[in-house]
Regions:
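Solvent-exposed loop/turn and edge beta-strand elements of beta-rich ligand-binding domains
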Residues: 1-260
């Protein structure tokens, strides 16, 4: 019988992305023939996921990059809704950075993620989670601040496009994943016993914190206004009237139907 030996890999090629192979035992037979011993190196495999913090689903449209410990960029890409797979990354410490969030979908940039690529041929997984914008709309009584049901509201963007419409139910109305930017909250119909409110302009910031917007309604008082012809005293229809307070704030506006 021949002698038995062990072949070990003590050092892999620098910056190659290969991982040390398992030791191999082999026996040299005393038969005069050439014997071949093959040691195969596997390599590192890294899977990067960009997911929604709430649903865990993969997100498309995020611009990501990976830098090494020296700050050198080794990879950049735009997510496509599937995990990003990389091979042969040298072992070491890396940082995953989101340079641009998919704000069109209402997401905000995530904090950078530091990760290690270790000496293994198994897939090493790294996940970066994106938070999203959250806006709470409050419709409140001007006198005591309690929430009002029965108001019809809508939100429009800077281009005048309607983003959302709803009727209040006495609870704050929450909207998620609004694109950061400028918006207008409009009351199209006031609750019974209240006057129509002025529009509220607000800006959605790029943050995962809850952003609050409040629109107040003033209670209506018992007041009958009539629009008449100065000569005939006849009631006039189709007159557009506005009531403003001492500060110039619009309290109510309407078009007369039969003079009232």
């Amino acid at each position: 019988a021949g002698e038995t030996y062990t072949l070990e890999e003590t050092l892999v090629p620098d910056n190659s992305g290969y991982v040390p192979a398992n030791a191999i035992q082999f026996t040299v037979e005393d038969n005069g023939k050439v014997q071949h011993v093959i040691m195969q190196d596997d390599y590192t495999k890294v899977q990067i996921s960009k997911t929604d913090i709430a649903t865990g689903k993969e997100i498309s449209g995020a611009k990501l990059k990976i830098t090494d410990a020296d700050g050198k960029t080794i990879a950049e890409w735009v997510t496509d809704g599937t995990p990003h797979y990389m091979e042969r990354i040298p072992m070491g410490t890396y940082t995953l950075t989101e340079t641009v969030a998919p704000i069109e979908q209402g997401y905000v940039r995530a904090e950078s993620v530091t990760f290690e690529v270790g000496p293994t041929e198994n897939i090493q997984r790294v996940e970066m989670k994106d938070d999203f914008t959250k806006v709470e709309i409050f419709k409140a009584d001007m006198t005591d601040g309690h929430e009002l049901p029965g108001a019809k509201l809508k939100i429009t963007d800077a281009s005048g496009n309607t983003i959302a419409e709803w009727e209040t139910n006495g609870q704050p109305h929450r909207i998620e994943r609004l694109k950061p930017g400028d918006y207008t909250l409009t009351e199209t119909a006031a609750p019974a016993g209240y006057l129509l409110s002025e529009e509220v302009h607000f800006t959605v910031q790029e943050t995962g914190e809850i952003q609050k917007v409040t629109m107040y309604d003033a209670p209506a008082h018992s007041l009958i206004l009539t629009k008449r012809d100065i000569a005939t005293n006849a009631k006039l229809a189709d007159a557009r009237l506005t009531i403003r307070d001492a500060y110039g704030t619009t309290i109510d506006r309407w078009t007369t139907t039969d003079g009232d």
